[in-house]
Amino acid sequence: SCINYGARLIRLLVPDREGQSENVVLGLADAEAYGNDQASFGATVGPVAGRIAEGKWGAVQLEQNAGKHHIHGGSRGWGQQFWGFTTEETAEAVSVTFSLESTPETVGYPGRLQAKISYTLDAEGCLTITMTGACSEETLFNPTSHIYFNLSGEAKRPITEHILQLACEEVLELDTDKLPTGKKR
């Protein structure tokens, strides 16, 4: 299930070993609760995910909404916007595509950015998330999907019992303010 506030994925039913479908996405009790959500449950975060030091990008001063830094597109970032949407269903897949025009007036980033995010669930149960953006001028674009998963279904077991394995050769180091240092490990 998705909602257009923040282009959020809020529920994903997956069959367990016995074939019983259970929700593996953590979320809030009801749709109204997302209006006060500080954790961005299931939200599309952008135009930039993560922190920007002192809210500065060249000559552009962004909102400093995380102490002296800027995080997740600011207080009016994409997770706090209502998106337009379309749905499509075929024999192979079902999808929802959210669209939003992000402007300097709404988020403070340069240019008029046409953003799209699609959630597609195919017949085999594979979820694909696709994000695209086209802007009228040079700007920052580094969104993410802020979905919290608990693969035990209905959050029956704590996340500390999960193992995450990433196929990467390096990770980017963060400093104590959770800002990228530029060093790779």
Please describe what each predicted stretch is:
Residues 1-185:
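Surface-exposed acidic/polar loop and edge beta-strand patches at domain peripheries
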